[in-house]
Amino acid sequence: MADILLLEPGYSNKYPPIGLMKISYFHKYIHHDYVRFAKGELPEAFREKKWDRVYVTTLFTFEWERTKKALEYALSVVKDPHQVYTGGILATLMPELIAENFPTVKNNTGLLNRKGTLGLEHEECVDTMTLDYGILDDIADQYVYPAHDAYFTYMTRGCGMKCQFCAVQTLEPEYIPFISITESIKRVDEQFGSKKDLLLMDNNVLRSPHFDEIIDEIKALGFQKGATYINPKTGKSVQRFVDFNQGLDAFLLTPHKAERLGELALRPARIAFDHIEDAETYKKAIRLCARSGITHMSNYLLYNGEDFTGKGHSYHADTPDDLYERMRISMDLCEELTAELNHKVAIFSFPMRYIPLSDLKRGFVGARWNAKYLRALQRMLIPTQGKGVSSHSFFEADFGKSSEEFVMYLAMPEEHLGWRGHFAKRKNESDAEMAERKKTWDENQQYLGEWKRRFLALGDDKDKFISYIGNNSYSVERYLEIKESELKKLYLHYFTIPTLLKSFLLENETEKNIIVEYITQEFPLMYERMIRYVAEGKLPYSMLEGAFRTLGATFAQSVLQHIDYTGTEEPFVVNSLIKVQKKARMSIFKFEYIQGYFLYKRVGALDRKSTNAIVDAIKNLDEGKTRSILADKFEKFKAKMIAQATENEVGAA
């Protein structure tokens, strides 16, 4: 009896590691070994234990860093470094990466569908083993897979369409048209309890000449249309669903196959819409499904791609306009079919970013995209919370009413994207809270209006401006590369406030004057927000130096007018102003007097009248009046300090 550790890297994923579950079943129920499953690392109780064998699964290539960490961990807890095994998607697609970095690790590429793959006694075909759902209990306190109450299985293997961007032809090169799952489902029921849903991982089930047999078997297993399931924990009856998780090929969907799919508790029917060139084929497939009684459908919309071949076709690299039109087609189909069939038809769209199979860091940018657009789209998808785009009103609010508006949103500063929409009262919000939020909202609308006005006025300079923001990195250095003053002003909207403050350090007065003129005269709200940020924040004095030298008393007075004088603790910015004035060798105001004001206030040496007078003097940079008030109240301040010290001594005694 051996000690076996199954390890999944510490990434977030929706589905449990099916390969490890099969390996666990073999070791636990056929080899009678002790098996433990961990995600990332083992709990503290197992830290000192050494294992006879460790299996590490792999997923996507862009998860290489987490995978590498898991393999390093495996080698640290195994007795013999030659007894670490890996496999899965990354390990199959990039075996040289495993070999180069982990020469002692045994890499099982492809499927475990041959006798003796793991080199163990009694090993036949691990790929057909029952899944050991029991291993999920090992990490129940640490991680729960979003999809866990389901049978995970295959009824076919492979695909055969040979799409250039797809890994299936490498992972599953041979097409197997039919795999019965009845016995494996029965074993799961007997050993681990029945499951609510049936999640089929087939890559191209519609290609199978045994399609009718597959549908019949699924129905016989209790997943016919309208099927229900008694939840063992609650005793309540709930709907069951079938999910061909890897999608249905629109090119292979016929009226007969759609009717047969309509006999299942299918939700959703996943139909890929990878290229705008496939629009008519996609629309035909959606209509067939809807007219066959399937009410919930979804699609993956591949974007950020290159020129591809697949399914006997050639495809051009997609554009942002293409993505918008594909989403729009699905929204229009929802309305069309809902009206035609007189019941709700839902189509959820999931934009899916293309990443080359060899990309280890998820940083690929397609030929017709740029980093700015990709980041903006990611931000725009946040409200969907991974549930897809299905509402027509939400679609137009978030993605625009036209492809031109969509592309404009992609070019918009990321922070601005969150400012769009309508103002509405929030639940349990007081009138005062709403008024304060409305004030900020109104300011944000001014920002949006100013940015939009300038962006729409770009004309022939639009492509040039997009080239300046395309890398999604905004700097003073890039600002200097821009020649046109109007483009420079628009570019300022992409600056963070720290970057805007840094721009005041420019030695070129002409370049600096463009900034000063724009934020103080043309769009003073930008200056106002910069000042508030300085007054309310905790910025080091070095960040204020450029603005202090350039704007002098104007900057200092603006900051002092936004300081909160109602408390007893001096704001952080006061000390920064003292330091920056000393560094700049300038004499605008004796900011130490402000420290004196807060010290006097702390001990109660200032009445309301003198408080108002000194605050007014400070805000107007009236150093003489400030000094005079502090001098007048000095004796009272001294008496308060003595009384406070005496009180403290008595208390200590």
Predicted regions and their residues:
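Radical SAM enzyme core and accessory elements
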Residues: D3-L6, K28, H32-F37, R47-E48, ...
